[in-house]
Amino acid sequence: MSNLSCAAPDVLERLDSFNMKLSQFVDLLAIILAFFASYFAIKIVINQSFFELSTKILLLQNLFYTNLYQISYGIEAIGMLYRGFFMLSEPCSILQSETSCAPYFKVLMIGTSGMIFGQTGLLIERAFATFATTYKTKKSVYIGVCISLIVLVCSTSSGFIILWDDPLEGWTIGCFAVSKSVVPRFNLFSILSTVLTLFNLIVSIFIQRYNKRFEFETRFKVGARFQKQELIESTGAICFLALSQFLWMFMYSFGILILRIIREDILPSTFYFWIAWCYTMPFIALMFPVLLIYRIRKTRARRTEKMKGITTEKQTQDDHIKQINAMWT
């Protein structure tokens, strides 16, 4: 076996470090919690949520990508721990070939990009729900299916694009690692992903404010006002998820980028210490079902109280005009 396939001393030190093992255990804990949270999130989305059918389709697709990522990364985390505990005496058996890792890396990228593109798909669907003159069940399903297919194509192609011309001739510590020949392309993907999550956040806030602005147009029509409030609440939940994803994604991409820039100026041990904790994708995958459950339950409770207020509230026309004027100032 060639020397290229044998782990260097710094790789062995990294695998043997307490920081690496702790970070992998934390990631595995996040993965396990994500599985349980996803189970309850799926039940709530299907049976108890206030979302339109198109939104449910996309939320379930996002939950699929969440678990696809967690499963693929969880397998690799277990492998890292196994090599760190039991294979340090076999340095020429630790590394994995980039050729064998390529299919696994592509699956990992499908899950990663699927979570990001899926959030964009949710916001596009919310835009349709907000600005379309009619958004009936049949139209909602058609839009949801079309957007989900676009997300599927984009997420599936991401891994293939990153590895497009990679010769895959090297060896790596784990299949989640990117070979040197495609690092610039992967860095570009990370930056674009952060920009996209920022775009998602801005669009979600714009849609939310747009809905709030016209909330009182139907003040004296209980049914129409309820539909408008339902739209605001469902969009608010998606906006909340977009904010969470942006914060974690910014921490990931910005942290990794800074570490790569200063890598030559710091010790390898310092670089690997921080890069283990900047990799926040397992927490992005965990927070999606957890926050989804939280928002649905909180909104349902608040919605019940608001419905009581809508049906019992008495307001004069002058009060209504004053409220509209205050809203526009």
Swiss-Prot record:
Key words of the record: Membrane, Transmembrane, Transmembrane helix
GO cellular component, one term: cilium
Listed transmembrane segments: 26-46, 68-88, 104-124, 143-163, 187-207, 238-258, 273-293
Keyword Membrane set for record: yes
Any GO MF annotation of the entry: olfactory receptor activity
Biological process terms in GO annotation: detection of chemical stimulus involved in sensory perception
Protein location: Membrane
Membrane topology: Multi-pass membrane protein
Pfam family, one: 7TM_GPCR_Sra
Family to which this protein belongs: Belongs to the nematode receptor-like protein sra family.
Name assigned to this protein: Serpentine receptor class alpha-6
Annotated source species: Caenorhabditis elegans
